A protein has these predicted regions:
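N-terminal organellar transit peptides
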Residues: 1-26, 30-118
Length: 118
């Protein structure tokens, strides 16, 4: 995945959230090197459970739902590694849908290292 590529990149990876890092963009932002994830004070990070869709018979739909649950587990693990929170804490944040954080809130919860005003 692109996240894995960025995490394994030998040079420092710096991410800067100028507007919003929502959905998979929030996962990519987590690939920043330690101390290198910054967000605008008026920026947002939005996290949620994985989404998907499927067509087919009931077995196909169950398989798709299981895969979406696995994606959610992987995403929550990435957030947990970055923030120092447990996977269960992350799942609690997203249990009721989208979880929005301002730049200041994202930093306070470990989803960003620095807040900037520009």
């Amino acid at each position: 995945t692109l996240y894995n590529f960025l995490k394994s990149y030998k040079a420092k990876v710096e991410t800067e959230v100028i507007g919003m890092a929502g959905s998979i963009a929030s996962v990519l932002a987590m690939a920043a090197s330690p101390g290198k994830l910054s967000i605008a004070r008026n920026g947002f990070v939005v996290i949620h459970r994985a989404w998907g869709g499927a067509i087919g018979n009931s077995d196909d739909l169950r398989a798709a739902a299981n895969m979406i649950d696995k994606y959610t587990d992987q995403i929550c693990d990435i957030y947990a590694q970055r923030t120092g929170k447990s996977v269960e804490e992350i799942k609690g944040l997203i249990a009721n849908g989208d979880y929005w954080m301002t730049g200041v809130e994202a930093q306070a919860q470990g989803f960003a290292d620095k807040v900037f005003n520009d």
